[in-house]
A protein has these predicted regions:
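Short beta-strand segments at enzyme active-site cores
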Residues: 40-41, 113
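Active-site-proximal, substrate-binding regions of enzyme catalytic domains
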Residues: 25, 45-73, 78-80
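Acidic, PIN/NYN-like endoribonuclease modules and their adjacent C-terminal/linker elements
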Residues: 2, 104-142
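Short, well-structured N-terminal submotif of metal-dependent ribonuclease cores
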Residues: 1-39, 53-60, 121, 135-142
């Protein structure tokens, strides 16, 4: 099972955001335990670096993002993905379209996001974190 984890789910863990933290943490644990192959889009890193600025120092942000990179693989963004996303008129949000491009590139089964409605045009189905855990809770047991 391969999943691309959207920036908002990663931020839930890094910021300890309630009520989302526990579910997001469980998904990252599945990735860390290699029960699920987790990926994130490369542009999630600078987005998170910026999002975390109010709660962490630069040094803390660097360390925590390096830690995340040990848990989930980073899928790069190249000119092909950018052009393809720019050509894709089915997405209102360019950043979401880049997430989808990265999910396609890694042959993800799902994009795990709290904004599944933003991915209705996606070639990869989007799933809410709680739906993913409910659907694949048996993976947690093994």
């Amino acid at each position: 099972m391969r999943v691309l984890i959207d920036t908002n789910v990663l931020a839930d863990v890094l910021l300890g955001r309630d009520p989302y933290y526990d579910i997001a943490y469980s998904i990252l644990t599945m990735c860390a335990d290699k029960k699920v192959y987790g990926y994130m889009a490369a542009h999630s890193i600078p987005n998170l670096f910026y999002i975390l600025r109010k709660s962490m120092t630069k040094e803390e942000r660097r360390e925590v993002l390096k830690d995340i990179c040990q848990i989930v693989k980073v899928e790069g963004i190249d000119s092909f993905k950018i052009i393809s996303a720019l050509d894709n008129v089915d997405f209102d949000d360019f950043e979401d379209c880049l997430q989808e491009e990265c999910a396609v590139a890694v042959s993800a089964d799902y994009i795990v996001t709290r904004n599944a409605k933003d991915f209705v045009s996606s070639r990869i189905p989007a799933i809410l974190p709680e739906q993913f855990l409910e659907k694949y809770k048996d993976i947690m047991q093994t």
